[in-house]
Curated annotation (Swiss-Prot):
GO terms for biological process: galactose metabolic process. It comes from Streptococcus pneumoniae serotype 19F (strain G54). This is Galactose-1-phosphate uridylyltransferase. Its main location: cytoplasm. It is an enzyme of class 2 (transferase). One of its GO terms (cellular component) is cytoplasm. Belongs to the galactose-1-phosphate uridylyltransferase type 2 family. It catalyses: alpha-D-galactose 1-phosphate + UDP-alpha-D-glucose = alpha-D-glucose 1-phosphate + UDP-alpha-D-galactose. GO terms for molecular function: UDP-glucose:hexose-1-phosphate uridylyltransferase activity.
Length: 493
C-alpha cells in the first residue's frame, strides 16, 4: 500500500471521516505534501510514523523547506485531519463528563496522544531515573525531548517582524494556530473550556510532558501570574473537578517563579511526586482552624501541609498564612519581606485530594539576592550550578529534577574521566569530576562509574533544593520556621 493510502486509511479509521471522504482526504494530503508522493510505498504502520514519513517526503520534494519549523507546521496540519474541531472536542468531553469525569479526562488524554499533540516519540528520548536521599526517593530527568533550533532558524527568528498574536504560548488563540519560526505550530491543538470561580479557563495537555498526564489549566484571558486567595480557591476547585489530578502553581515572583509569568496558569497531572510522600515531622493546629490538620513535612524546602474535608477552611487558612508570609521578616536567618517596597515573599502552592480529604502544600519562597549570591539567596548556589542553574519551579519543588540536555554527554564524559579515559571534561565540571575521582581512585568499570556519576547528580539536586529552602535543615533553621508558624497563630499545648 502506498504511504498516502495508508495515512488516509488511518485518518478514516481514527476520526469522523468516512470511506466516501477518501478522495477528498487524499487531495488534502497531496496539497500539503506534493503530488510526487502519490506513488511512494511504505512499510510503516503507525499513524505518527506515517505522518513523519510524509513530512520527510515533503522536504525531499521541496514542497517545504528543510527546517524544523517547516516540519512542525506540516506535521501538525496533517494530524489536524484526525482531530475533531474544538466545539466537537468540547461537546464530547462534557457529554462524557456527565456520566464519568474520569472517562472524559481519559478520552481527551488519548486524543492528545493519538493526534501527536503530546510528543510521545520525543518524550521517550528523555533520561529518567530515581535516587535515594534523606528525603525519600527523588526523580531525575535529563530533558532531551524539546528540539533545539539550528543556528539558521535562530538567525531567521531575529529577523521576523514582531507579532503579538498569540500573545504567548498559553493563550487560547494558540488553538489551531499555523505556527511560525518563533512560535510553535498548533494546528492539532485542542483546549477544553470550563468555568472556574466565575471565569473561563482552559484545560490542555503539555506537549513535552515531564510526568504522567502532565496538563495545564490556563486563564481564558492573558493576565499575569498572581498568587492570591483566588489561587487556593482555583487549585482546590481543579482537584475536585478533575478527579485523580493534583494541581499546583508556580510562584509569581522572578527567581523563584516559573518560566512563564505573563499568563496565569496552573499545572497538574496524574503523578505521585516525592514531596507528596514526605511525612509530617512536626504537627500542630492553627488557632481558629482547629479542624485543619497542619504540620511541617520532612523536605529540603520549607513546606506547610494543610489537610481538611472543608475547602473553605483550607482557603481561609492558606490565605492567612500567605498574607503573614508576605510581610514577615526574620533578620536572624536572612529572611526579608521586601526591599524599598519590592516584595520578596510568595508561595508555591500545590493541591491534591487524598483519602477523601483536600490537601494543600504551601512552599515558602523568598527571592532576595545578595553580593554573595547575585542569582538568589534561595536559589541554586554557584557550586551546584554546573548541574542546575535555572529557577526552581513547581515541578522541581516537588522533587522532580528537570536537567538540561547538555548533561547527557557531560555525565558520560565525567564517567569516562573516572575510569582513566582521555576525555575532555567541561571546565565547570572539573572540580566535581576531580572530587569523584579522589573518592573512587581505582575505578575501572565504566557502568559502575556512570552509576556513581548519576547518583552524584541526585545528591547535587538535593543540595539544589536545600539551597532553595528558606528555612535550613538545622536546629537554627527549624526553630526559626516555628517562629513563623507561631506568628501565624497556633494552639499551644
Amino acid at each position: 500500500m502506498t504511504l498516502v493510502d495508508k495515512f488516509v486509511t488511518h485518518v478514516i479509521s481514527e476520526s469522523s471521516f468516512e470511506e466516501m471522504d477518501r478522495i477528498y482526504l487524499t487531495n488534502r494530503v497531496l496539497a500539503r505534501v506534493g503530488e510526487g508522493v502519490l506513488e511512494v510505498e511504505t512499510n510503516l504502520d503507525k499513524l505518527i510514523d506515517l505522518k513523519d514519513q510524509l513530512v520527510e517526503e515533503a522536504v525531499r520534494l521541496e514542497t517545504i523547506e528543510d527546517s524544523q519549523t517547516a516540519r512542525e507546521i506540516l506535521g501538525t496540519e496533517l494530524m489536524d485531519l484526525v482531530t475533531p474541531c474544538p466545539s466537537q472536542v468540547n461537546r464530547d468531553f462534557w457529554e462524557a463528563y456527565a456520566y464519568s469525569p474520569e472517562q472524559a479526562i481519559e478520552d481527551f488524554y488519548q486524543l492528545s496522544r493519538k493526534n501527536d499533540y503530546i510528543k510521545l516519540k520525543a518524550i521517550a528520548k528523555n533520561i529518567a531515573y530515581r535516587v535515594p536521599s534523606d528525603y525519600g526517593e527523588l526523580e531525575i530527568t535529563i530533558n532531551l525531548s524539546k528540539p533545539e533550533k539550528d543556528p539558521k532558524e535562530i538567525a531567521v527568528a531575529k529577523l521576523v517582524q514582531a507579532s503579538n498574536y498569540p500573545q504567548c504560548q498559553l493563550c487560547l488563540e494558540n488553538e489551531g494556530y499555523h505556527g511560525r519560526v518563533n512560535h510553535p505550530a498548533r494546528s492539532n491543538h485542542r483546549i477544553i473550556r470550563f468555568e472556574m470561580v466565575g471565569q473561563e479557563w482552559g484545560f490542555q495537555y503539555s506537549p513535552y510532558a515531564y510526568f504522567n498526564e502532565h496538563c495545564i489549566f490556563l486563564d481564558g484571558q492573558h493576565r499575569p501570574m498572581a498568587i492570591s486567595r483566588q489561587s487556593f480557591e482555583r487549585l482546590l476547585a481543579i482537584v475536585e473537578q478533575f478527579p485523580g489530578y493534583f494541581a499546583g502553581s508556580n510562584a509569581d515572583l522572578p527567581i523563584v517563579g516559573g518560566s512563564i509569568l505573563t499568563h496565569d496558569h496552573y499545572q497538574g497531572g496524574r503523578h505521585v511526586f516525592p514531596m507528596e510522600l514526605a511525612p509530617l515531622q512536626k504537627t500542630f493546629r492553627f488557632a481558629g482552624f482547629e479542624q485543619v490538620k497542619a504540620g511541617i513535612i520532612k523536605w529540603p524546602m520549607s513546606v506547610l501541609r494543610l489537610t481538611s474535608d472543608s475547602k473553605e477552611d483550607l482557603i481561609n487558612l492558606a490565605d492567612k498564612i500567605f498574607q503573614e508570609w508576605r510581610q514577615y521578616s526574620d533578620s536572624s536567618v536572612q529572611i526579608l519581606a521586601e526591599t524599598d517596597g519590592t516584595p520578596h515573599h510568595t508561595i508555591t502552592p500545590i493541591a491534591r485530594k487524598r483519602d477523601g480529604q483536600f490537601e494543600l502544600d504551601l512552599v515558602l519562597r523568598d527571592n532576595q539576592t545578595s553580593a554573595e549570591h547575585p542569582d538568589g539567596i534561595y536559589h541554586p548556589h554557584k557550586d551546584v550550578q554546573h548541574i542546575k542553574k535555572e529557577n526552581i519551579g513547581l515541578i522541581e519543588v516537588m522533587g522532580l529534577a528537570i536537567l538540561p540536555p547538555r548533561l547527557k554527554e557531560e555525565v558520560e564524559q565525567v564517567a569516562s574521566y573516572l575510569v582513566g579515559e582521555a576525555v575532555t571534561v567541561a571546565d565547570y565540571h572539573q572540580e566535581w569530576a576531580d572530587q569523584l575521582k579522589s573518592q573512587h581512585p581505582d575505578l575501572t568499570d565504566k557502568e559502575k562509574a556512570l552509576a556513581i556519576v548519576k547518583d552524584s547528580v541526585g545528591a547535587i539536586f538535593v543540595r539544589v533544593l536545600e539551597d532553595a529552602g528558606v528555612y535550613k535543615q538545622t536546629e537554627q533553621g527549624q526553630t526559626a520556621f516555628m517562629r513563623f508558624v507561631e506568628q501565624v497563630g497556633i494552639l499551644l499545648d
